[in-house]
Regions:
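Dual-mode signal for accessory low-complexity, basic/Gly-rich regions
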Residues: 250-336, 340
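Fold-independent oxyanion-binding glycine-rich loops
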Residues: 73-76, 125-126, 227-229, 300-301, ...
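Short loop/turn motifs at secondary-structure junctions and domain boundaries
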Residues: 230-234
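Charged, compositionally biased interaction regions
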Residues: 1-37, 53, 308-420
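Active-site bordering "gate/hinge" segments
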Residues: 1-218, 402-420
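Tryptophan-anchored aromatic micro-motifs
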Residues: 223-225
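Active-site and channel-lining beta-strand-loop segments
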Residues: 236-253
Length: 420
């Protein structure tokens, strides 16, 4: 499927489908919301009606659809957008209608393409525009994409065993990184046969590796802060998110503050801060003012991290790779949206039972309140990470990562790439 270019079908959050790299990212940014010219309730209802008709007409083809096989690229220069007064934007009413359409369209798609009957696979390769080291970076990307999954699977099991004994996890930043998060975890009714974390190697997401869960929202709170992260084609600077009861309460980024002249006044700073907040809401949260924390994960691919640091390309890597290079947090839906009732088992035979949270479980009462159609990962790189600590019910503290290095027994081999 070719990526849409018309305003009727264009996704403001980015391109979906096969497409070339953009010749003008500022142009794309300026025209994200051109549909604001005509977006009203009549249009929303008509678009939903056409969607239903199209799926009914092609239901045989939809039933045979197994899911996407995606090849991403990376290496373009990082992009920091400039807000233009002339660019269209949604009014509050249009934003509400847009979100309502997303909520109403998701059950339609799931009716014809059930989430528990499809999968996906995704991989990324560098472009020559990444610089003079392209050939070497390409070779190392191949190495990263073909790491020994059995070795990582065993190492990650040590992390999961520690996490399954936790009441909650504490994540702290290091240096200028102000992250201070408490992540509450789902309860296990039978620890002998159940686990909270999926042992993820390279079965769908390439490269490997991570362990991830759907956090319990109640009790999950604190500040997430990242100095720089590349999401949806935009480099976010000094990104922050505050969480309370597992839900985003405030966001900010320094993209527009950084661009101000040294003698900017307070009003200019206030406007730049608000522009940064809106950028996060539009590009990361897909117009939602608040979202739950849908995922907490610990990435273990220190080889990818070492490569990125060696070539100085961390801010040009896609989130597909970056999410494996430290702990990451996704806002929006869980990793199991629309397939929560399908059992999932780790290689050790334990069932991964933390497939729901307090929001997704609402699907049993009102599906429109359970999903957001959003899942955006935000990673803290190892160098900005102070510690990840398991806190057990009795108060015992067990370190998984300290000062950017794996210290949990059984995981020390992951530090070899960092030492090189």
């Amino acid at each position: 499927m070719r990526a849409a270019v018309d305003s009727v079908n264009k996704n403001p959050a980015g391109r979906a489908g096969y497409t070339s790299s953009s010749p003008n990212k500022q142009y794309d940014y300026d025209h994200r919301y051109d549909s604001a010219v005509y977006y009203d309730k009549a249009f929303r209802d008509r678009k939903l009606s056409v969607l239903k008709t199209a799926y009914e007409q092609y239901k045989k083809e939809a039933a045979e659809y197994a899911g996407p096989a995606v090849v991403e690229t990376f290496g373009e220069d990082s992009f920091s957008p400039v807000n233009k007064e002339e660019a269209w934007s949604f009014t509050e009413k249009q934003q509400r209608l847009f979100l309502e359409y997303r909520n109403l369209s998701m059950p339609v798609v799931n009716q014809y393409i059930p989430g528990d009957e499809t999968s996906f696979t995704i991989i990324a390769f560098p472009l020559p525009s990444i610089g003079p080291d392209f050939e070497e970076i390409f070779k190392e990307t191949i190495d990263i994409n073909t790491l020994d999954y059995v070795k990582y699977q065993k190492i990650q099991q040590h992390i999961i065993d520690a996490l399954d004994r936790a009441e909650y996890v504490e994540v702290l930043g290091n240096g200028k990184n102000r992250t201070n998060l408490r992540i509450d975890l789902a309860e296990l009714s039978d620890p002998a046969s159940q686990t909270r974390f999926e042992n993820c190697v390279a079965d769908v997401n390439i490269p490997l590796g991570e362990v991830f869960t759907s956090p319990r929202l109640s009790g999950t709170e604190g500040l997430l802060h990242v100095g720089s992260v590349y999401i949806s084609g935009i480099q976010f600077k000094d990104l922050t998110m505050e969480f309370k009861e597992g839900r985003v309460t405030s966001v900010s980024c320094g993209n527009f503050l950084e661009a101000l002249p040294p003698l900017a006044g307070e009003q200019e700073k206030k406007e730049a801060a608000e522009a940064g907040r809106k950028l996060v809401v539009q590009e990361i949260m897909n117009q939602h003012e608040t979202l739950p924390m849908g995922e907490f994960a610990i990435g273990t691919n220190t080889t990818a991290y070492a490569m990125a640091e060696r070539f100085g390309i961390t801010d040009r890597l896609p989130i597909l790779i970056v999410e494996k290079m430290g702990p990451h947090f996704a806002v929006g839906d869980t990793c199991y949206s629309w397939s929560e009732d399908s059992p999932m088992y780790n290689p050790d035979g334990k069932e991964m039972t933390a497939r729901d949270n307090e929001v997704s479980i609402l699907r049993k009462e009102d599906v429109s309140r359970a999903y957001f159609g959003v899942h955006k990962d935000i990673t803290i790189p190892y160098k900005e990470l102070g510690s990840i600590t398991v806190v057990e019910p009795g108060g015992t503290r067990v370190s998984i990562i300290k000062d950017g290095r794996f210290v949990l027994p059984g995981t020390e081999e992951l530090n070899q790439a960092l030492d090189r």
